[in-house]
Amino acid sequence: MSSGRIVQIIGAVLDVEFNRNEVPRIYDALQVDGTETTLEVQQQLGDGIVRTIAMGSTEGLKRNLSVTNTGGPISVPVGVGTLGRIMDVLGRPIDEEGPVEADERWSIHREAPSYAEQSNSTELLETGIKVIDLLCPFAKGGKVGLFGGAGVGKTVNMMELINNIALKHEGLSVFAGVGERTREGNDFYHEMQEAGVVNTEDFSKSKVAMVYGQMNEPPGNRLRVALSGLTMAEYFRDTKDPATGKGRDVLLFVDNIYRYTLAGTEVSALLGRMPSAVGYQPTLAEEMGMLQERITSTQSGSITSVQAVYVPADDLTDPSPATTFAHLDATVVLSRDIASQGIYPAVDPLDSTSRQLDPLVIGEEHYNVARGVQEVLQRYKELKDIIAILGMDELSEEDKLVVYRARKIQRFLSQPFHVAEVFTGAPGKYVPLRDTIASFKAIIAGEYDSLPEQAFYMAGGIDEVVAKAEKMKSSAA
């Protein structure tokens, strides 16, 4: 293993000089002797000098310190030993529960599966959230994006999906916290303990591995932590489960993909690259592709991923969310307008889409009900301007009916969440897809036109709406 010395330090960027015939390769991990600091090679500048990004704080480092080339990229522990543990970007434990006992370590830089190895799935993944199951259904082994500005509920929606899917789905999950709040990571860990997904008595019985690179960490950590989490998920997908003899079906949760892009922007600027549109790095599409192409399903197992995507200034045309759109099978768009009406989850039923919304995949009935709901909501959206100027009285009877039904649909798309019980006091509801389709089919057919729209708000199934309406009727009498 070759060794060199630090010749320049600018924040998180360090230049290291090696002998000309021992220059490290791009992405090689270097260890600063006598410290915990790991560096990753980003550029070869010539004359034996490489430019690196520090995976951690550079406090206390100085010029002429000795650096050793590890001879390979950053590697992280993989396998059953990672379950129930919280690790950093380098796979080091940060939960104060002792070392991670793993038999293998995998490099975080890996080739994406070849076209021949990939497999398609049209099997639906039921989430128990009405608006998602009806209008933007998820595929097993698919990629889902939760798009939204600040404070519209991306993390809460993701937590509910973890609660509904990961707890019912018997497989394993990996959670990558990329540049998010430490408080949220802490809350998530304790929620997983309460739910029994993390078993601190016997980690081998746990169902989730957690990798965190939070907001307060240097850009190198935030840029690579998504790859560390993905590598752990790939191991479960690609290695045979002793019980079944084939790869596992894994859930990968990434919160937040925008922070991954932002860390790339910071690193790009530190490396002296010329910025591109809106100040983003010129390699934005390539970096996003390198990550997303690896999140896929193969013949041996599947990775179903749910990714939260922050939308800066609520602008979906911003280069970062716009680049992410191209890679996803389903997009759940969270709207500030809907959140301001108190309707949660604040999913925009007209903007959210899914490739699975096809009669050949989900069946004629589901497809027709979903399109019927969207048709009513779209017509209501068009009528809003007329109502604002002339009032409801100027509408035809047919249009009035559309408005009343649309308002009921809007409210019925809201739902109390299990993870929000502590804040709202309302018990969470899991609504099976079969019930969701039947309920909305009846609403657009006019079967519940006589019920007040308040009864539809924050209800689970349609039976609950009917019971609420009866209660309101008796209390008014």
Swiss-Prot record:
InterPro entries named among the record's database cross-references: AAA+_ATPase, ATP-synt_VA_C, ATP_synth_F1_bsu, ATPase_a/bsu_AS, ATPase_alpha/beta_chains, ATPase_F1/V1/A1_a/bsu_N, ATPase_F1/V1/A1_a/bsu_N_sf, ATPase_F1/V1/A1_a/bsu_nucl-bd
Location within or outside the cell: Cell inner membrane
UniProt GO molecular function: ATP binding; ATP hydrolysis activity; proton-transporting ATP synthase activity, rotational mechanism
SUPFAM superfamilies found in the cross-reference section: C-terminal domain of alpha and beta subunits of F1 ATP synthase (SSF47917), N-terminal domain of alpha and beta subunits of F1 ATP synthase (SSF50615), P-loop containing nucleoside triphosphate hydrolases (SSF52540)
Membrane topology classification: Peripheral membrane protein
Keyword hit for Metal-binding: no
Binding site residues for ATP: 148-155
CDD domains assigned to the protein according to its UniProt record, in alphabetical order: ATP-synt_F1_beta_C, ATP-synt_F1_beta_N, F1-ATPase_beta_CD
EC number from the UniProt entry: 7.1.2.2
Gene Ontology CC entries for this record: plasma membrane; proton-transporting ATP synthase complex
Reactions listed under catalytic activity: ATP + H2O + 4 H(+)(in) = ADP + phosphate + 5 H(+)(out)
Keywords: ATP synthesis, ATP-binding, Cell inner membrane, Cell membrane, CF(1), Hydrogen ion transport, Ion transport, Membrane, Nucleotide-binding, Translocase, Transport
Lineage: superkingdom: Bacteria
Subunit details: F-type ATPases have 2 components, CF(1) - the catalytic core - and CF(0) - the membrane proton channel. CF(1) has five subunits: alpha(3), beta(3), gamma(1), delta(1), epsilon(1). CF(0) has three main subunits: a(1), b(2) and c(9-12). The alpha and beta chains form an alternating ring which encloses part of the gamma chain. CF(1) is attached to CF(0) by a central stalk formed by the gamma and epsilon chains, while a peripheral stalk is formed by the delta and b chains.
PANTHER family, per database record: ATP SYNTHASE, ATP SYNTHASE SUBUNIT BETA, MITOCHONDRIAL
HAMAP family xrefs: ATP_synth_beta_bact
Family statement: Belongs to the ATPase alpha/beta chains family.
NCBIfam families registered for this protein in UniProt: atpD (TIGR01039)
Protein's job: Produces ATP from ADP in the presence of a proton gradient across the membrane. The catalytic sites are hosted primarily by the beta subunits.
UniProt-recorded name of the protein: ATP synthase subunit beta
Source organism: Psychrobacter arcticus (strain DSM 17307 / VKM B-2377 / 273-4)
